[in-house]
């Protein structure tokens, strides 16, 4: 326990919290344009071919974002919506693209029946 005199000489400092999604500048999402599409291999214990996109945000910042799901229709100069959320086994990938917005369509290479609704995309009802 510090003494009163010690606290007078060296006041307590608040902890600084780092922001992992600095390119979004405090916004929940930002619009971006695809510059390059790539396939990247993950870190050591995992083995796959993950799809990522290099984007230019509306603030003219360049970032790398993960493309979720099976199959995509993105090309160079496609408009996309970016949110925070990293891919744990891909170094340097701290952002994720949102499906169903702008040029990034919701359709996947095969239909999922078990996947829950996300971003207001309703599941097919059985009669």
UniProtKB/Swiss-Prot annotation:
Organism: Acanthamoeba castellanii
Compartment(s) of residence: Mitochondrion
A Pfam family the protein falls into: Ribosom_S12_S23
UniProt keyword annotations, A-Z: Mitochondrion, Ribonucleoprotein, Ribosomal protein
Protein name: Small ribosomal subunit protein uS12m
GO cellular component, one term: mitochondrion
Gene3D superfamilies according to UniProt: Nucleic acid-binding proteins (2.40.50.140)
PANTHER family found in the cross-reference section: 30S RIBOSOMAL PROTEIN S12 FAMILY MEMBER (PTHR11652)
Molecular function terms from GO: structural constituent of ribosome
């Amino acid at each position: 326990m510090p003494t009163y005199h010690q606290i007078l000489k060296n006041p307590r400092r608040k902890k600084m919290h780092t922001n992992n999604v600095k390119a979004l500048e405090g916004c929940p999402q930002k619009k971006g344009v695809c510059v390059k599409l790539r396939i990247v291999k993950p870190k050591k214990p995992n083995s796959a071919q993950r799809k990522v996109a290099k984007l230019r945000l509306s603030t003219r910042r360049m970032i790398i974002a993960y493309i979720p799901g099976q199959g995509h229709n993105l090309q160079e100069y496609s408009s996309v919506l970016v949110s925070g959320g990293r891919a744990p086994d891909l170094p340097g990938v701290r952002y994720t693209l949102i499906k169903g917005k702008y040029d990034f369509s919701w359709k996947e290479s095969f239909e999922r029946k078990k996947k829950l609704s996300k971003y207001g995309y309703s599941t097919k009802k059985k009669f």
